[in-house]
A protein has these predicted regions:
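Conserved small-residue-rich beta-alpha loop and adjacent elements
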Residues: 49, 53-133, 137, 165, ...
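Short acidic capping loops at alpha-helix termini that bridge into adjacent secondary structure
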Residues: 140-144
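A structured beta-alpha segment of the ubiquitous adenosine-cofactor-binding alpha/beta core
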Residues: 40, 53, 71-78, 146-162
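Conserved NAD(P)+-binding/catalytic subdomain of aldehyde/semialdehyde dehydrogenases
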Residues: 85, 146-207
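N-terminal Rossmann-like NAD(P)+-binding subdomain of aldehyde/semialdehyde dehydrogenases
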Residues: 1-76
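Short alpha-helical
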Residues: 12, 95, 121, 153, ...
Length: 207
């Protein structure tokens, strides 16, 4: 399985990740961004555990959401089906490669991943491991694809592939999400930017 393969090849992932970390330091990434970029054994185990959790979820495909019978006797139902090919654009968090791919595969979709340049070596290592793993269980290797070109042009071109992509999901900061929403010809599922904080007054009743 993908989870087992990630654990088995953790040394390869860490080696590739170290290259990204050094590059990140060279270009002046903040300590918090370096932390997001870093993959140690614990985080790789966390990725594998996440894949296993997704795998253990009920199969969503084929579930009947609703239905009714028309006056002429015809029964109409709404059934969950795969979206098709999902594109995901994300930034310097290589764990997204495993998270996104496993979620897409679970729902019967193929995925095209486009990560940031800061994590390209980590992303390539993880994507290769996952592609090899799915092929071993009889799935098409290309059900998981990674765009290795990290220039702005590659993300711009991805946003224009309305004939090939069924939906595009940006995952990252407000700037990335805004750029995808405003420029994509592919339908976009707009995500939140994260970093949402809740302040709880010391006199609040938590219960």
């Amino acid at each position: 399985s993908i989870a087992d393969a990630l654990i088995e090849h953790k040394d390869e992932i860490i080696k590739a990740n170290n290259i990204d970390i050094e590059y990140g330091k060279e270009i002046g990434l903040t300590p918090s961004l370096i932390d997001r970029l870093t993959l140690g054994e614990d985080r790789i185990k966390g990725m594998a555990d996440g894949v296993r959790k997704v795998s253990s979820l009920p199969d969503p495909i084929g579930n009947v959401i609703s239905g009714n019978t028309l006056p002429n006797g015809l029964t109409v139902t709404r059934v969950k089906v795969p979206l098709g090919v999902i594109g995901i654009i994300f930034e310097a968090r290589p764990n997204v490669t495993a998270d996104a791919a496993s979620l897409c595969l679970k729902a019967g979709n193929a995925v095209i991943l486009r990560g940031g340049k800061e994590a390209i070596n980590s992303n390539k290592a993880i994507a290769k491991i996952m592609r090899d793993a799915v092929e071993k269980v009889g799935l098409p290797k290309d059900s998981i694809q990674l765009i290795e070109d990290t220039t702005r042009q590659s993300s711009t071109e991805l946003m224009q592939l309305s004939d090939y992509l069924d939906v595009l999901i940006p995952r990252g900061g407000a700037g990335l999400i805004k750029a995808v929403v405003e420029n994509s010809k592919v339908p976009v599922i707009e995500t939140g930017v994260g970093n949402c904080h809740v302040y709880v007054d010391k006199y609040a009743d938590i219960d």
